């Protein structure tokens, strides 16, 4: 779990 690789936030397509 961590920042999304695309948006830089935790609530992204890549948790």
UniProtKB/Swiss-Prot annotation:
Decide whether keyword Secreted is in the record: yes
* This protein's record includes keyword Ion transport: no
The UniProt entry lists the main location of this chain as secreted
Q: Which InterPro entries match?
A: Pyrokinin_CS
Its GO biological process annotations read: neuropeptide signaling pathway
Give the Gene Ontology MF terms in alphabetical order. Answer: neuropeptide hormone activity
Q: Which residues form a coiled coil?
A: none
One GO CC annotation: extracellular region
Q: Where in the cell is it found?
A: Secreted
Leucine amide: modified positions: 15
Tissue distribution is: Both CAPA-pyrokinin and CAPA-pyrokinin(2-15) are expressed in CNS, ring gland and abdominal perisympathetic organs (aPSO) but not in midgut or thoracic perisympathetic organs (tPSO) (at protein level).
Arranged from A to Z, the UniProt key words for this protein are: Amidation, Neuropeptide, Secreted
* Family label: Belongs to the pyrokinin family.
Query: What is the documented function of this protein?
Result: Mediates visceral muscle contractile activity (myotropic activity).
User: What is the protein's given name?
Assistant: CAPA-Pyrokinin
Q: State the species of origin.
A: Delia radicum (Cabbage root fly)
Question: Lineage of this protein's species?
Answer: Eukaryota, Metazoa, Ecdysozoa, Arthropoda, Hexapoda
